[in-house]
């Protein structure tokens, strides 16, 4: 299987930070942490920033990934949260 550029750059296990941008709703952070907890149990401390108008939240959360597949799987699951607008 062909590796992409990101996968080639990472050495596992590694710390990987997701930045999730979504609607400023109270359940956003809980949904993000719940999805990550299901795949990689642990204590997570998300960093939360609000947009200037308060319509959006930016949540940064760091995981310890063991495989590239974990990173990819979480990316797709976080992207599928209905109030999420972008995952970086």
Curated annotation (Swiss-Prot):
GO terms for cellular component: cytosol. InterPro entries: UPF0250_YbeD-like (IPR007454), YbeD-like_sf (IPR027471). It holds the Pfam family DUF493. PANTHER family: UPF0250 PROTEIN YBED. Belongs to the UPF0250 family. This is UPF0250 protein bbp_432. It comes from Buchnera aphidicola subsp. Baizongia pistaciae (strain Bp).
């Amino acid at each position: 299987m062909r590796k992409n550029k990101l996968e080639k750059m990472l050495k596992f296990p590694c710390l990987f930070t997701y930045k999730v941008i979504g609607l400023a709703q109270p359940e956003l952070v809980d949904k993000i942490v719940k999805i990550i907890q299901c795949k990689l149990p642990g204590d997570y401390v998300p960093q939360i920033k609000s947009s200037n108008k308060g319509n959006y939240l930016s949540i940064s959360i760091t995981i310890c990934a063991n495989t590239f597949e974990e990173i990819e799987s979480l990316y797709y699951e976080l992207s599928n949260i209905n109030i999420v607008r972008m995952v970086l």
